[in-house]
């Protein structure tokens, strides 16, 4: 199985709105496996297709401690939201940067599973946060976009400094 390269901020592909997936294919099934492999290896709890340079509406998530509850969603959409939660988020495309983000705590999600079937389910707390974070990627939005201007600027400066330090070491 191939580990995919994770696209890093400020790559322009992270700002593109992704195209819907017309149907499930063998290629997409392989991509889903590779995305899970890449996400687990990173390690992370969610990964969106644009983070691996694929501009399609596809996300994978697994918030379980044992990494045995994988969820792959094609063309995911949030149907309903309720509540509010603040969670410290990070992103595999902006490594080392974490910030508290306010989001709905409960969501109703609809999408296509890897068998090509339409599914709908409720997600709460961390799973809801993770799915919303990944769907944001499909719409060209990053978690830092939810921050105030000052916090966003500080996060970006910190990230750029860390990347420069890594490049020089």
Curated annotation (Swiss-Prot):
InterPro entries: Peptide_deformylase, Peptide_deformylase_sf. Its EC number is 3.5.1.88. Keywords: Hydrolase, Iron, Metal-binding, Protein biosynthesis. It is an enzyme of class 3 (hydrolase). The active site is at 134. It catalyses: N-terminal N-formyl-L-methionyl-[peptide] + H2O = N-terminal L-methionyl-[peptide] + formate. This is Peptide deformylase. It comes from Hydrogenovibrio crunogenus (strain DSM 25203 / XCL-2) (Thiomicrospira crunogena). One of its GO terms (biological process) is co-translational protein modification. SUPFAM superfamilies: Peptide deformylase. The keyword Metal-binding applies. Its cofactor is Fe(2+). Removes the formyl group from the N-terminal Met of newly synthesized proteins. Requires at least a dipeptide for an efficient rate of reaction. N-terminal L-methionine is a prerequisite for activity but the enzyme has broad specificity at other positions. Belongs to the polypeptide deformylase family. It comes from the Bacteria. Binds 1 Fe(2+) ion. GO terms for molecular function: metal ion binding; peptide deformylase activity. Gene3D superfamilies: Peptide deformylase.
């Amino acid at each position: 199985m191939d580990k995919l390269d994770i696209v890093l901020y400020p790559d322009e592909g992270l700002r593109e709105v992704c195209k819907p997936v017309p149907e499930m294919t063998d290629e997409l099934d392989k991509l889903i496996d590779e995305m899970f492999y890449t996400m687990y290896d990173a390690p992370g709890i969610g990964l969106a297709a644009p983070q691996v340079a694929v501009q399609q509406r596809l996300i994978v998530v697994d918030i379980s401690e044992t990494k045995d509850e994988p969820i792959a969603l094609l063309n995911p959409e949030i149907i309903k939201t309720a509540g509010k939660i603040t969670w410290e988020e990070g992103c595999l495309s902006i490594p080392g940067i974490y910030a508290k983000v306010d989001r709905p705590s409960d969501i109703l999600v609809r999408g296509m599973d890897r068998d090509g079937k339409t599914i709908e389910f409720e997600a709460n707390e961390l799973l809801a946060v993770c799915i919303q974070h990944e769907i944001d990627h499909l719409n060209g939005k990053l978690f830092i976009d939810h921050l105030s201007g000052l916090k966003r600027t500080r996060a970006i400066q910190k990230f750029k400094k860390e990347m420069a330090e890594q490049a020089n070491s």
